[in-house]
């Protein structure tokens, strides 16, 4: 018969410490980690009056808006605060305006402590500033150059985009491949929602075939060109030089990029991915899936609108969503 006896009093502390370590090691795989991911919107979320309340109520925001007027060479604040929808739709205004609104919100928010970040298309530049990779001035300068380069590319190659609702990604890809014209997937927004990009004739043909294949909607978009497609090659070449000569810093947290839905701590890789973004699809579905797999429990949209929150709920239904 074996009788267990407690250790002598002098050894009780070491015994309990040892027992505690064993229990901790046993429970370690089940430790709950609650990580926050901040996500930044792209073009299309602009609205008249955006940022005006921030300008009037916060000195940090006011200083950043005034600095933006200097960097851009025109008073973007006048268009953002009082411009009409047509003025806001101008590419030279839209992209800097959304970037400004997003980055300034992140700057003035006391709760902004991201564990990881990502941005949809244009929003990737906001994410790079928020993670310390780019300075505010350099980020804004690149966004301005991106907007102008894309506008020129649209003038060279008249083109458009369309939203396809209700078909799986593989079916959309197959239809795009079957068309003897430039038509490619541009935004993998969420399951059952994919935006295609290409020539006007190619998009018209694609919309007809998508509808015949069972798409609930095949909706041409009111945009100036085929973003995230080979037709943006002139803009990619133009922006490449600007990105390569801009100083990039090591990110303070993981930045998930559009072209591969992954993050990198290597500056050269971040630059290469950012250059490729203009002619490559935005892999948003995979980005959110990867962020969730790697610990993100709450996705916080930082910028105008709530479009990204809706996409997250469709991609990762168990995740929490919020906005600032």
Identify what each model region corresponds to:
Residues 16-19, 27:
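Short hydrophobic targeting helices and cationic amphipathic motifs
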Residues 24-32:
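Short, positively charged and aromatic/hydrophobic N-terminal segments
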Residues 35-171, 217, 221, 298-324:
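FabD-like malonyl-/acyl-CoA
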Residues 43-45, 72, 131-279:
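Alpha/beta catalytic cores of group-transfer enzymes, especially the acyltransferase/condensing modules
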Residues 110, 211, 292-293:
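Non-catalytic positions within long, well-ordered alpha-helices that form the structural scaffold/packing
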Residues 280-296:
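A short, acidic, amphipathic alpha-helical segment used as a generic capping/interface helix at domain edges
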């Amino acid at each position: 018969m074996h009788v267990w006896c407690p250790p002598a009093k002098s050894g009780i502390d070491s015994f309990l410490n040892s027992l505690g370590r064993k229990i901790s090691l046993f429970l370690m795989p089940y430790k709950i980690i609650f990580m926050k991911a901040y996500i930044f919107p792209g073009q299309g979320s602009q609205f008249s009056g955006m940022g005006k309340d921030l300008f009037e109520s916060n000195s940090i925001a006011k200083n950043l808006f005034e600095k933006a007027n200097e960097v851009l060479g025109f008073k973007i604040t006048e268009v953002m605060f009082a411009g009409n929808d047509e003025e806001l739709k101008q590419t030279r205004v839209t992209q800097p305006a959304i970037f400004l609104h997003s980055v300034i919100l992140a700057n003035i928010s006391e709760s902004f402590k991201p564990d990881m970040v990502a941005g949809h298309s244009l929003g990737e530049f906001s994410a790079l500033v928020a993670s310390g990779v780019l300075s505010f001035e350099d980020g804004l300068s690149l966004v301005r150059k991106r907007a102008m380069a894309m506008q020129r590319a649209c003038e060279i190659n008249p083109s458009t985009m369309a939203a396809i609702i209700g078909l799986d990604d593989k079916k959309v890809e197959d239809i795009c491949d079957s068309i003897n014209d430039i038509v490619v997937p541009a935004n993998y927004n969420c399951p059952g929602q994919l935006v295609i990009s290409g020539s006007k004739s190619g998009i018209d043909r694609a919309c007809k075939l998508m509808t015949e294949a069972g798409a609930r909607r095949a909706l041409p978009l009111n945009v100036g060109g085929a973003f995230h497609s080979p037709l943006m090659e002139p803009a990619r070449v133009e922006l490449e030089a600007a990105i390569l000569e801009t100083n990039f810093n090591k990110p303070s947290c993981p930045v998930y990029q559009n072209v591969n839905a992954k993050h990198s701590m290597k500056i050269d890789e971040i630059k290469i991915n950012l250059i490729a973004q203009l002619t490559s699809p935005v892999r948003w579905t995979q980005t959110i899936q990867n962020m969730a797999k790697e610990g993100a429990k709450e996705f916080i949209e930082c910028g105008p609108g709530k479009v990204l929150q809706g996409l997250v709920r469709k991609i990762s239904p168990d995740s929490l969503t919020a906005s600032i």
